[in-house]
């Protein structure tokens, strides 16, 4: 057993260096995630709320009316050192258009993500039927990654 223990430890070190839930990352075709992430926020979603709003700013002419679709996800942080408390999803724009990059605010413990409106139904379906996780990774080269994903689900 003493001879096997160091071998098991050596084999597990590369696994320990990888962030939790790294198996859910897409292939790194552009080699942006070669180094270990400098920070990870991982949240298991336990509650959500949806806000569909309309706004009219009366001091502007012509008077524009804007509408927004937002979702607030709350849950429990899972990764070591994670401080995340909530995720604010804003749905705007169209698929294929450039969206704002993911941003984590340490002060408010809020991760802000932007998705095209076309992703709303997919995300609602996940929230209604699966355990959902939100992951945010930052890298020393300035690259950031954020996603919503389920755990591994067995087919029925």
Spans of features found by a protein language model:
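Positively charged n-region of N-terminal signal peptides that target proteins for export
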Residues: 1-4
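Bacterial N-terminal signal peptides
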Residues: 6-14
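OB-fold ssDNA-binding interfaces and closely related basic DNA-contact patches used
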Residues: 18-84
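A structural detector for beta-sheet-dominated domains
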Residues: 46, 51-53, 70-74, 90-92, ...
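Predominantly extracellular/secreted and cell-surface proteins with exposed
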Residues: 70-111
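Acidic, glycine-rich flexible loop segments
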Residues: 98-151
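Short, solvent-exposed mixed-charge patches
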Residues: 154-156
